[in-house]
Amino acid sequence: MHLILVRHAKAAPGQPDALRPLTTSGHLKAIELGELLARKQPAAIVSSPLLRARETAAAIARVAGLEPVVDERLAPGATAEGLKKAVAGLGDTVVTVGHQPDCSEIVLALAGREVEFPTGGFAEVEL
């Protein structure tokens, strides 16, 4: 499986953590990500339940012609094992949208390499 881990785009401060929406620049970045990642023909997009991740996933999904799936296993504190269970059987290429430091820790666990994840950043891993 080709796995594309995305960190949510830039979110606005001043809200309870789970309810922080994307900023205007965050929405634009999410659309840009969608245009880039749609070329990789993902079979599914799986998101953390937090609003900023769901909004990022929705923007990517719109461009890719998909409906995002929300999975609690991608919420803050996500693990490589939980992520593997969340994407099992979803297709050859899957995009996940999550949080830091989880994204970096998952790439390290799955691929043995350290990756920086700015907001709206992504990394690709083969499972």
Question: Model-flagged regions — what are they?
Answer:
Residues 2-80, 91, 103, 113-120:
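Active-site-proximal alpha-helix that buttresses catalytic centers in soluble enzyme cores
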Residues 92-109:
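A glycine-rich beta-strand to alpha-helix segment
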Residues 121-127:
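Short phosphate-coordinating micro-motif centered on Lys-Gly-acidic
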